[in-house]
Amino acid sequence: MAVGKNKRISKGRKGGKKKAVDPFSKKDWYDVKAPGSFTNRNVGKTLVSRTQGTKIASEGLKHRVFEVSLADLQNDEDNAYRKIRLRAEDVQGRNVLTQFWGMDFTTDKLRSLVKKWQTLIEAHVDVKTTDGYTLRMFCIAFTKRRANQVKRTCYAQSSQIRQIRRKMSEIMVKEASSCDLKELVAKFIPEAIGREIEKATQGIYPLQNVFIRKVKILKAPKFDLGKLMEVHGDYTAEDVGVKVDRPADETMVEEPTEIIGA
């Protein structure tokens, strides 16, 4: 009697079940370091796959862009509405050295500035710094009521808007083209350019809330490690905790321990 193939009996798979591998076991953490223009140099940590064959870990980290709040970089909550973009340029040991790569405003801050009864004036300009970076800077400003003004509205005329926009562009070009990127970032943090524009346009129409709201880097020069190290300075210095003196009345008193059954 011929015995046929029983299709109901399932065959066991070869090799059995595959062992689950934790993907993080093949990755390493690197410290992200901000340029010397900022107070807090430790931005955070980033993850990358370990060097395997031709795939080098440091190459996978280069040109990564990190977005950080200026409040964290300056330890000042008043700057929470600014977002700073930092691009990874080089890897030194476990440290990722970054360079300024742009700036933007948070959406809620921009929306809070726009109000009724005033004119919004915007200008943008392309500038080149002394160290070869080409940037596009966007400026925003709002008209305000003159002193002792009774009328509720403060709308500027078209001719005044054109004059203000021209003045904005002139000041942005003058401030950016006369310094390198590091010095320009130092001007962005305290909003020095915005105050300069506000002062210069006072005779045309009084302005308020004048900000460089956005900065985009269009073109960067060829990578130079020497210049990057100048920007970072001593990046190896780690944050050390501050020693706290314990008050005399808080000193711990050792109490005798009672041994049960002795």
UniProtKB/Swiss-Prot annotation:
GO molecular function, one term: structural constituent of ribosome
The UniProt record lists the keyword Cytoplasm: yes
Organism superkingdom: Eukaryota
Subcellular location: Cytoplasm
Keywords, comma-separated and alphabetical: Cytoplasm, Ribonucleoprotein, Ribosomal protein
Matches recorded under InterPro entries: Ribosomal_eS1 (IPR001593), Ribosomal_eS1_CS (IPR018281), Ribosomal_eS1_euk (IPR027500)
Major location category of this protein: cytoplasm
Region (Disordered): 1-21
GO biological process, one term: translation
Annotated GO CC locations: cytosolic ribosome; cytosolic small ribosomal subunit; nucleolus; plant-type cell wall; plasma membrane; plasmodesma
Basic residues bias locations: 1-18
SMART domains reported for this sequence: Ribosomal_S3Ae
A Pfam entry, by short name: Ribosomal_S3Ae
Family: Belongs to the eukaryotic ribosomal protein eS1 family.
Subunit structure: Component of the small ribosomal subunit. Mature ribosomes consist of a small (40S) and a large (60S) subunit. The 40S subunit contains about 33 different proteins and 1 molecule of RNA (18S). The 60S subunit contains about 49 different proteins and 3 molecules of RNA (25S, 5.8S and 5S).
Name of the molecule in the record: Small ribosomal subunit protein eS1y
Source organism: Arabidopsis thaliana
Lineage, uppermost ranks: Eukaryota, Viridiplantae, Streptophyta, Embryophyta, Tracheophyta
Gene from which this protein is expressed: RPS3AB
